[in-house]
Curated annotation (Swiss-Prot):
Described function: Regulates the activity of L-type calcium channels that contain CACNA1C as pore-forming subunit. Regulates the trafficking and gating properties of AMPA-selective glutamate receptors (AMPARs), including GRIA1 and GRIA4. Promotes their targeting to the cell membrane and synapses and modulates their gating properties by slowing their rates of activation, deactivation and desensitization and by mediating their resensitization.
Protein name in UniProt: Voltage-dependent calcium channel gamma-4 subunit
Organism: Rattus norvegicus
Residue intervals passing through the bilayer: 10-30, 108-128, 137-157, 187-207
Gene name per UniProt: Cacng4
Similarity annotation: Belongs to the PMP-22/EMP/MP20 family. CACNG subfamily.
C-alpha cells in the first residue's frame, strides 16, 4: 500500500512538473497577458488638419505580453510593436520606486528565472525516477520547484504593481480603466500553483523514503545483534539476566540464613547424599561483595558441624547394630 501511494505521488509529481513548465513557457512566449485600449493603433491615421485626437477618446483594443503589444483594431490591426517602458517624453526619477519597477518589468527577470528553475526541477524529477535509491535528487527537485513558484509569484506581483500592464501611450486619467488580464496571465498564475504543489509532493516523497530507510537500517541492526555469536555465550546470557534479577536476589538472600535447629535428620545419611548436599551448597558462595554477610557464613559453619556430628552418631549406631545382631 505504501509503495502504491508512493508510486502515485511520483506519477503526480512527474505530470505536475511537465504541466508547470509548459504553462510557464506558454505564458512568457505569448502576448495575451493584458487586453487594453491604446492610441498606438490609430495614431498615424490622423492628419494635421484633423488636429490631435480628443482627450477623452479611447484608443483601439490591443493585447500585450511581456515584450510586445499587438493591435486588434485600427489601421495597424494584426501588427505588433515592441513595448517601450521608458518613453522619451516622460521624465523619470532614477531613484524612484516606479523607475525600479519599470526596470524589473522590462527585463522580466522573474518569469524567466521561474522557467529555468522549473526546467531544472523537471530534470531532477526524471533523474530521481531513474536513480530511485538516491533520495537527494528528489529533495533537490522539491527545492527547485518551490523556488520557481516563489520567483513566479514575485514576477506576477511586479507586473501588477508596476501599473504598466497597459503598455500604450494612455493618458494619466485613462490608465486606471479599460484593461483586463488575458489567458497568458492566468497560465502564469496557474503555473505557480502547480509548481508549489509539485514541490510539496517531492519533499513529502523524500521524507517518506528517509523514514523507510531508517526503519530498515534499525531492523537490520537488531537482527544482526540477535544473531551475534556473543549472545549465545553463557557468560553473555548470565550478564544479561544478572541485571534483570538484581532486585530478586536481594529479596531471596534472607532465606539462606536458615537455622539448623529446625532440621531433623533420621537415620544415617549415606555418603552419596552427603556429597550431593555439599555440592548443592557450593554455588551459593558465588555472590558479589555486596551480598556478603558474617552471619550467613557463621550459619553455614554451624550447619556443616551439625552434619558431621550426625554422620558420626549414625555411623556408630550402625556399627552397634551389626555387632548385636545374631548371625
Amino acid at each position: 500500500m505504501v509503495r502504491c501511494d508512493r508510486g502515485l505521488q511520483m506519477l503526480l509529481t512527474t505530470a505536475g512538473a511537465f504541466a508547470a513548465f509548459s504553462l510557464m513557457a506558454i505564458a512568457i512566449g505569448t502576448d495575451y497577458w493584458l487586453y487594453s485600449s491604446a492610441h498606438i493603433c490609430n495614431g498615424t491615421n490622423l492628419t494635421m488638419d484633423d488636429g490631435p485626437p480628443p482627450r477623452r477618446a479611447r484608443g483601439d483594443l490591443t493585447h500585450s505580453g511581456l515584450w510586445r503589444v499587438c493591435c486588434i483594431e485600427g489601421i495597424y490591426k494584426g501588427h505588433c510593436f515592441r513595448i517601450n517602458h521608458f518613453p522619451e517624453d516622460n521624465d523619470y526619477d532614477h531613484d524612484s520606486s516606479e523607475y525600479l519597477l519599470r526596470i524589473v518589468r522590462a527585463s522580466s527577470v522573474f518569469p524567466i528565472l521561474s522557467t529555468i528553475l522549473l526546467l531544472l526541477g523537471g530534470l531532477c524529477i526524471g533523474a530521481g525516477r531513474i536513480y530511485s535509491r538516491k533520495n537527494n535528487i528528489v529533495l533537490s527537485a522539491g527545492i527547485l520547484f518551490v523556488a520557481a513558484g516563489l520567483s513566479n509569484i514575485i514576477g506576477i506581483i511586479v507586473y501588477i504593481s508596476s501599473n504598466t500592464g497597459d503598455p500604450s501611450d494612455k493618458r494619466d486619467e485613462d490608465k486606471k480603466n479599460h484593461y483586463n488580464y488575458g489567458w497568458s496571465f492566468y497560465f502564469g498564475a496557474l503555473s505557480f500553483i502547480v509548481a508549489e504543489t509539485v514541490g510539496v509532493l517531492a519533499v513529502n516523497i523524500y521524507i517518506e523514503k528517509n523514514k523507510e530507510l531508517r526503519f530498515k537500517t534499525k531492523r537490520e541492526f537488531l537482527k544482526a545483534s540477535s544473531s551475534s555469536p556473543y549472545s549465545r555465550m553463557p557468560s553473555y546470557r548470565y550478564r544479561r539476566r544478572r541485571s534483570r534479577s538484581s532486585s530478586r536476589s536481594t529479596e531471596a538472600s534472607p532465606s539462606r540464613d536458615a537455622s539448623p535447629v529446625g532440621l531433623k535428620i533420621t537415620g544415617a545419611i549415606p555418603m552419596g547424599e552427603l556429597s550431593m548436599y555439599t555440592l548443592s551448597r557450593e554455588p551459593l558462595k558465588v555472590t558479589t561483595a555486596a551480598s556478603y554477610s558474617p552471619d550467613q557464613d557463621a550459619g553455614f559453619l554451624q550447619m556443616h558441624d551439625f552434619f558431621q556430628q550426625d554422620l558420626k552418631e549414625g555411623f556408630h549406631v550402625s556399627m552397634l547394630n551389626r555387632r548385636t545382631t545374631p548371625v
